[in-house]
Structure formats: structure tokens, C-alpha cells
UniProtKB/Swiss-Prot annotation:
Organism: Rattus norvegicus
Matching Gene3D superfamilies: Ankyrin repeat-containing domain (1.25.40.20)
GO process terms (BP): apoptotic process; negative regulation of apoptotic process; negative regulation of DNA damage response, signal transduction by p53 class mediator; negative regulation of MAPK cascade; negative regulation of NF-kappaB transcription factor activity; negative regulation of release of cytochrome c from mitochondria; negative regulation of transcription by RNA polymerase II; positive regulation of cell growth
Protein's cellular compartments: Cytoplasm; Nucleus
PROSITE patterns, sorted: ANK_REP_REGION, ANK_REPEAT
Protein name: 26S proteasome non-ATPase regulatory subunit 10
Primary localisation category: cytoplasm
Signal peptide: none
Keywords, in A-Z order: ANK repeat, Apoptosis, Chaperone, Cytoplasm, Nucleus, Repeat
Length: 231
């Protein structure tokens, strides 16, 4: 079968966008709507992955559980947010998807939205109660991801929703450390103007300025001094 991702026919139909065939199968056997495959995924997981909004809406109308997790702890919301499925994220949230659910890495849907620069989805999640400072198993937040990836608008969005700039991950790095290390100049400058400390040391006993390359460290030092002087 085209696009065979699952050992369950109903999941393959969901992934391939075969709405009519899916409806026919489920109406003949309602239990198929919630049956799990080799990855502990349901038809809803696979429809979210492939972005088939009509199939997602059909399944949600049937009342399928929205918070079931696959064998890696991914909920349909994780999958839709990571894949950039705006309309599906909206539909899942309306149906009560748990916005702060974590997968086996400790990541929320917001971690993936921030990492993959999904602006509208990040706003929907935050408006829906997502914790902007949620930490994964490495103590990294969405801000760590946005800063490291150079997603400037995402940094702005997270700041608007009061995300902290000085949380340290398991390596002792703040988002500013990561922005400096990856030479994300505009992101680093923005973080410093919004209260990110240039003095916090990571586990290698390095501050963001010591991690910064080229002339970035000097630029950040001047910004920080200017901010301190105006306080």
C-alpha cells in the first residue's frame, strides 16, 4: 500500500488522507478509531503527522482520546506542533489536548514549536496555557531552543509571554550561552536587552561573553553596561 507507515490499515488510511475509506472502516468497526499500532500510535497520531485536517476533525467528532501517547511519549499535539500543522493544533486544543504534556525526552509541544520556528503554533500553545519555562530532561527550555537555532521572532514571542532568560540547562548554559556559541548575534543582543545575564558561568566556568566569538562579546558587554546604567 502507498505510504505504508503502520501495521494497522486504519492508521495507513489516516496517514495517506483516505477519508472516505477511513470512515467506511471505522463505521464498520468503531474500535478501529482507537486501536494502536506497532508504535502505540492511533489513526489520530498519523493524521496529525501527515496534516490531514478533515480526518483529524472526523476522529475528534467521534470522541477519540486526544492525549494518548505513542511509544516515545508523543501525543497528537506534540506531533502536530512539530510538523507545523496549525489548524490541527487549534482543533486539538479546543478538544482539550494537554498543552504541557511531556514526551520521553521531557519535551512539551512548545519545545518543538520553538525549535522548528512555528510562530502561530507557539502563540496558540502559550495562549492555551503552555508553560514558557517548561524544562526537558536536559533542563532546556523553549528559549534555549529558539536562541540556539537563531529563531529571532520566536525569542520575541517567548519574551512577550514572560519566558525567563536565565534558566541554566544541565551543562549550565543559559539561552544566551547558546546564542553566543552559535553566533546568533541578533538573538544574543535581544536577550541581553531583556535581562539575560552576561555573568552566569556554565559548567566549564565560562560566561556567555567567554563563549562569544569575534566581536560579539564586546557588543554584548556594552549593551549590558548601558542597560545597567539606565536602571
Amino acid at each position: 500500500m502507498e505510504g505504508c507507515v503502520s501495521n494497522l490499515m486504519v492508521c495507513n488510511l489516516a496517514y495517506n488522507g483516505k477519508l472516505d475509506e477511513l470512515k467506511e472502516s471505522i463505521l464498520a468497526d468503531k474500535s478501529l478509531a482507537t486501536r494502536t499500532d506497532q508504535d502505540s500510535r492511533t489513526a489520530l497520531h498519523w493524521a496529525c503527522s501527515a496534516g490531514h485536517t478533515e480526518i483529524v476533525e472526523f476522529l475528534l467528532q467521534l470522541g477519540v482520546p486526544v492525549n494518548e501517547k505513542d511509544d516515545a511519549g508523543w501525543s497528537p499535539l506534540h506531533i502536530a506542533a512539530s510538523a507545523g500543522r496549525d489548524e490541527i493544533v487549534k482543533a486539538l486544543l479546543i478538544k482539550g489536548a494537554q498543552v504541557n504534556a511531556v514526551n520521553q525526552n521531557g519535551c512539551t509541544a512548545l519545545h518543538y514549536a520553538a525549535s522548528k520556528n512555528r510562530h502561530e503554533i507557539a502563540v496558540m500553545l502559550l495562549e492555551g496555557g503552555a508553560n514558557p519555562d517548561a524544562k526537558n530532561h536536559y533542563d532546556a527550555t523553549a528559549m534555549h531552543r529558539a536562541a540556539a537555532k537563531g529563531n529571532l521572532k520566536m525569542v520575541h514571542i517567548l519574551l512577550f509571554y514572560k519566558a525567563s532568560t536565565n534558566i541554566q540547562d544541565t551543562e549550565g548554559n543559559t539561552p544566551l550561552h547558546l546564542a553566543c556559541d552559535e553566533e546568533r548575534v541578533e538573538e544574543a543582543k535581544l536577550l541581553v536587552t531583556q535581562g539575560a545575564s552576561i555573568y552566569i558561568e556554565n559548567k566549564e566556568e565560562k560566561t556567555p561573553l567567554q563563549v562569544a566569538k569575534g566581536g560579539l562579546g564586546l557588543i554584548l558587554k556594552r549593551i549590558a553596561e548601558s542597560e545597567e546604567a539606565s536602571m
